[in-house]
């Protein structure tokens, strides 16, 4: 053997070994993923789906990564490249704008979360945001302080305008001047010019004109102005001692409208004047309509309202606006002279004393009747003195059985009723005012092209509708050229919103539903045609299990040429000619056959006017029994779209949104799974050659997530074939059984592939946290039988859980249930019907269907009767008509059968399910000495809004399940409760530390 070679080999081995050893000693070991704890949720960062924005040229994408609590950042990166920049955005993300040429980016940077929290403790402290403007080719960033509203100048993309936020003056009043500085910046060189006291501004679509309104102290210089960006000339359009508001450009940018409001001390509201401005070959003719100068046609006692934005008709012949009643200011009666009033009162007292002394001395008074006659005879003549003007009135409400709307509903709607206004128009070519809407037609929609309007009057049916929930209305057609109205349909029935009229884009026809069929009404000819009766498909939504008659499936949309409507049956999409003569086509063809639902169309152009059948259309698809999702494409044909959809994406994930760049064939779609956060991918028109753009959830590798999901098939006790999603716990080992929480709310198995971001929900529930912490989560579907909403849950959930147990995943002795609102009701009811579950957490549950029926849904002010009879309650009448059903399905009347420990969340200001529902069940269980804890958060509504409350309950609910399902030690609040005097100390020990 060559000794030298051996020595070299040994030396090399020694050096290599030492190097590896040194590297091993200095390298940081990879962190082992752990279950996520609630205190780690606050710092969890993720992409906000609504923030994802494509540049018009398709070159750039911007998106925000925000924490649950704290400060976030904006990521700006190349769509097909790794080039990117990250910018801080503070504690709030306001959105982002690209210039139309894709060269510039602008966004607001909010204050830091620490500053926001500190300011919250200092009443009156004003915080200011910054505007950041970025040149994408160089990453040069320019910052502007005190940023308010901002916008690039449309197609020209040469300037950006920024409204600077005013500093609030001490003692500022709501009526003070609202104008502030407006800054206009030339993007290419950063040069700027400004105007003071600007309250509103807006560019036209081209971006060559900037309209702005001035609102100055003392109304000095108030008016409407127009700035030509190229010539830098300002044109004064109108000025007056008035306030100007509601600036509104037409979509084309060839005209705009606004309101001029003048104070009149005799009335509570300002008097309005509508102003219209046209853009015509370098000139800007102004059209003004002042109702005070038109006593002949404008209704007396009314004015143009400031509560509706005016706008031009498409042909620029008319201005549309709202009018409302003027409410006079009540004159205060002069207060009586205090000296004279005192003297008068002394005189009355003296006269009364003398009269009573005389009566007392009268020996002829023997009986009560004698006394009453003497008192009446001796009453002083003449009027009583006027009551002082500051007499205190009672604070009360009168509830009358003849009220069409409950007083509670009237209270909720009070401001809307006060500000109610009627659509009217002014023809600038004839100088004619026309009131389009009257007091009979309280609801009105002006249709496209402003030729017609549809109005509804439900006054004859409103009383009954508030009781039984069945919706009827009288439908009127209004000709906007003449102002004449025609009753089209009397007592038109809306089993659901899908039966309501939907107009064509040329404004001459509308689609509506009746008796399970779709019809087209032609307004110029006043004719109607049934367009679905001859088709080999039903458009009745047979899966709608509410107490309504023949609800329809949904409209996909009108075609842009107004010749077709695209309508879904339960599976496929049909292209149906509106003339009722030509042949309808099943575009998707295989939906029913393959149990694929073609759910709807992706609208890729937000400014489109109808579905362009000359372009490919992208359709969302979903596998009813596989839970797959994807995107299919329909191609243009000789007549409309070509039958037969091409599947572009079809996978075991949730394919969510699809977007397209405004000016490029660049598409972006989202994809997620139950254990994989939502990511966005750039692709082409065929959805091939995809590139992942986002990198969501930067900290996801630190934590353990669900190990998988299983689809559980089962049959309800009533023979319905149903499914449930069984999410495996993190670290799942086959053959091992796990504690499980069952969650439900009607049908949710379609969420099998949906990612649930860690967070503090308003109900305390987050399945991602539960699976991360070793729970299996099972989400079964529930379908309903009329008059048995509680028993329906029993018939579905119990067989579902039994089927899930057969998978071998679930420990049958460690199952809990949870639901909120209607799901809370199902939880409360299930706890009365079975001992299968070892713990139950019910959020805001309905517990007494008899008393709940007659209570108020305080958030809307309406009664619960309509909800019970035509909506979620699924009863066919009131309790007196269906007594056994109400008792049979009420947790409170079955409370003696409860064996499951119960945690109830119910808040004292719950405006959906009255707080008394939780109290009733709690007290009944307590009376029966059954384990129950009710958690109440003061001032909270149906769900928890305050972050500190959401944090607190999220932890408590998991502690509850940990104790009963995992055998963890019981916290003191669960074991023995907390006395009132110790509550503050208890809460202090549990409070989350504020995030740095």
Task: Name every feature range the model reports, one short phrase each.
Residues 307, 316, 450, 553, ...:
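Active-site lining segments that contact anionic ligands and/or coordinate catalytic metals
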Residues 16, 22-678, 682-683, 971-979, ...:
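Beta-propeller folds
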Residues 458, 622-623, 672, 743-747, ...:
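Glycine-rich His-Gly loop
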Residues 218-219, 265, 281-282, 478-484, ...:
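Secondary-structure transition/capping motifs at alpha-helix termini
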Residues 534-546, 687-689, 694-814, 818-820, ...:
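Cap/lid segment of the alpha/beta-hydrolase catalytic domain
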Residues 1-30, 846, 863, 996:
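Bacterial Sec-dependent N-terminal signal peptides
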Residues 757-996:
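Active-site-proximal cap/loop segments of hydrolase catalytic domains
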Residues 434, 454, 529, 681, ...:
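Hydrophobic/aromatic beta-strand patches that form the interior of the parallel beta-sheet core
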